[in-house]
Amino acid sequence: MRTLWIVAVWLTGVEGDLSQFGDMINKKTGTFGLFSYIYYGCYCGWGGKGKPQDATDRCCFVHDCCYGSVNGCDPKLSTYSYSFQNGDIVCGDDDPCLRAVCECDRVAAICSGENMNTYDKKYMLYSLFDCKEESEKC
């Protein structure tokens, strides 16, 4: 019950595209994205360091790198326009920064869906303290 309460409190603080990103992951993986990926491996969730643990974690590593290349807005707080058309995620913003954030999320959601077979529950709630190897460069 305590875990459910913590997740509920955390979700009330989710704004902008992080909730949108969660929605994209939900559609592409069939999972509750924010819960399934929030502390997965070394890169899914807040921060990231070390070596990605599997292909799923690598999707998050690439997503972090993509966010790092966005200029002109805060990727974690920006709200963008997108839709689902015939199972595809379509980014719809004219603003270059918002479109870039949406594209980062779109690519990561597709990657997560394509790598569901590598998702390993042993990496759920993974501690960054276990991510000791040298971090890769983007």
From Swiss-Prot:
Binding of Ca(2+), residues: Y43, G45, G47, D64
One of the record's GO cellular component terms: extracellular region
Signal sequence interval, chain numbering: 1-16
PROSITE patterns: PA2_ASP (PS00119), PA2_HIS (PS00118)
UniProt enzyme class: hydrolase
Known EC number: 3.1.1.4
Catalytic residues in the record: H63, D105
Disulphide linkage map: C42-C131, C44-C60, C59-C111, C65-C138, C66-C104, C73-C97, C91-C102
Keyword Isomerase: no
Keywords: Calcium, Disulfide bond, Hemostasis impairing toxin, Hydrolase, Lipid degradation, Lipid metabolism, Metal-binding, Platelet aggregation inhibiting toxin, Secreted, Signal, Toxin
Cofactor: record remark: Binds 1 Ca(2+) ion.
Catalytically driven reaction(s): a 1,2-diacyl-sn-glycero-3-phosphocholine + H2O = a 1-acyl-sn-glycero-3-phosphocholine + a fatty acid + H(+)
One Pfam family hit: Phospholip_A2_1
Main subcellular location of this protein, as a coarse class: secreted
GO terms, biological process: arachidonate secretion; lipid catabolic process; negative regulation of T cell proliferation; phospholipid metabolic process
Lipid metabolism is among the record's keywords: yes
CDD domains membership: PLA2c (cd00125)
Cofactor(s) listed in the protein's UniProt record: Ca(2+)
Tissue expression profile of the protein: Expressed by the venom gland.
Source superkingdom: Eukaryota
Compartmental location: Secreted
Described function: Snake venom phospholipase that inhibits ADP- and collagen-induced human platelet aggregation. This inhibition is completely inhibited by abolition of catalytic activity in case of collagen as inducer and partially inhibited in case of ADP as inducer. PLA2 catalyzes the calcium-dependent hydrolysis of the 2-acyl groups in 3-sn-phosphoglycerides.
Family indicated by similarity: Belongs to the phospholipase A2 family. Group II subfamily. D49 sub-subfamily.
Assembly notes: Monomer.
Protein name: Acidic phospholipase A2 2
